[in-house]
């Protein structure tokens, strides 16, 4: 846990952006010098809760609570229209993500922005985590503030991002009002994991994703789950970039990198969503398919640093589709071994599940 503590401190103490006057804004750099990643702020808040929960280090929390609040308050300031959702700086409108810019989230080559489902789910967990930390310190007013932020976000999330036509969540709703739904398993599943989707709708959503996998003939569960089961529109991808589609239907690069490629680590959320709704059998079906591949060491192929050489992403037939080769994220799905146990799932996700 000292490494976790050091990592949190590195980001919240040394990677906060300053405005023209030199004042800290609360926004954190994501990687290199890239800013405007909403999840860059949510992640350290969640990690701080993990650290304190695991260690009971209240002295550290007392020293860092002000920094954590500044990080969270930046997120609250990004609810620019007051609906409860955290709006990204990026519009998410088609054809607006151009080099050298990046999107608002881990999926940095996908043109997600404005009201983004992935980052808002993480912000929801982050607010709940910080509220719990404030409660541990007896800071009632602050706990109420972050609880209210989480409540507002939850109230707006499903009505804003649910697609009644498909029964799935859209990945993001762009500034022009368009809901961008590409049948994205991780996006739907993460929201289910965190209780942002009503139970009946959650079960139906998972059913629909299985149906969609059958429709598109995806069978390689040993690899994990594709990013999306419907090809991305060319304007929904960073241009120009590795994996960027050129054909109007997006099929020319479908299955490559972030246009429907497979990043094994994110399969955690799809597996865990089944455990969350009581469908252990289908969650285990994916986990048990992936474990032998992990045992053989096939979710990494060493440092590559070359497009189409890294096994950190694969195509639907298991060919390399990434560029890093070794990516620690890839092994995140192993957490599902713990998440299948109700008591451990509640322990890890207590702020969002209680």
What would you call each of these model-derived segments?
Residues 32-35, 39, 43, 47-54:
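Hydrophobic/aromatic-rich effector regions of fungal transcription factors
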Residues 48, 67-82:
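Active-site cavity-forming subdomains of large catalytic enzyme subunits
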Residues 84-86:
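Acidic, glycine-anchored loop motifs typical of Ca2+
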Residues 18-35, 96-115, 176, 248-249, ...:
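Acidic/His metal-coordination segments adjacent to aromatic residues that form catalytic metal sites
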Residues 51-54, 58-60, 70-72:
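Hydrophobic or amphipathic alpha-helical targeting/insertion segments
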Residues 1-13, 28, 66-73, 114-136, ...:
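Active-site core of glycosidic bond-cleaving carbohydrate-active enzymes
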Residues 74-81, 95-106, 118, 122, ...:
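Calcium-binding acidic motifs and repeat modules
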């Amino acid at each position: 846990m000292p490494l976790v503590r050091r990592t949190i401190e590195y980001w919240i103490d040394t990677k906060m952006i300053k405005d023209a006057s030199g004042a800290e804004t609360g926004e954190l750099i994501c990687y290199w010098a890239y800013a405007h990643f909403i999840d860059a702020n949510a992640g350290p808040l969640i990690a701080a809760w993990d650290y304190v929960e695991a260690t009971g280090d209240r002295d550290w929390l007392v020293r860092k609570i002000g920094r954590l609040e500044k990080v969270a308050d930046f997120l609250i300031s990004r609810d620019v229209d007051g609906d409860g959702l955290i709006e990204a700086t990026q519009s998410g409108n088609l054809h607006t993500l151009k080099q050298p810019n990046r999107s608002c989230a881990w999926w940095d080559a996908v043109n997600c922005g404005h009201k983004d489902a992935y980052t808002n789910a993480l912000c929801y967990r982050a607010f709940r985590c910080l509220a719990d930390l404030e409660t541990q310190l007896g800071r009632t007013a602050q706990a109420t503030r972050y609880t209210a932020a989480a409540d507002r976000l939850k109230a707006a999330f499903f009505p804003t991002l649910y697609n009644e036509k498909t029964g799935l969540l859209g990945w993001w709703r762009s500034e022009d009002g368009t809901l961008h739904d590409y049948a994205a398993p991780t996006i739907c599943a993460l929201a289910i994991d965190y209780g942002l989707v009503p139970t009946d709708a959650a079960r139906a959503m998972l059913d629909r994703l299985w149906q969609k996998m059958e429709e598109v003939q995806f069978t390689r569960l040993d690899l994990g789950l594709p990013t999306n089961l419907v090809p991305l529109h060319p304007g929904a991808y960073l241009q120009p970039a590795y994996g960027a589609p050129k054909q109007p239907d997006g099929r020319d690069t479908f299955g490559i990198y972030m246009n429907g490629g497979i990043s094994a680590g994110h399969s955690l959320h799809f597996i865990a969503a089944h455990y969350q709704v009581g469908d252990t059998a289908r969650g285990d079906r994916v986990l048990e398919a992936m474990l032998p591949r992990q045992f053989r060491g096939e979710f990494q192929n060493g440092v590559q640093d070359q497009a189409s050489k890294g096994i950190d992403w694969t195509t639907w037939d298991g060919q390399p589709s990434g560029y890093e080769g070794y990516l620690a994220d890839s092994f995140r799905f192993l957490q599902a071994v713990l998440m299948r146990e109700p008591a451990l799932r509640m322990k890890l996700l207590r702020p969002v599940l209680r």
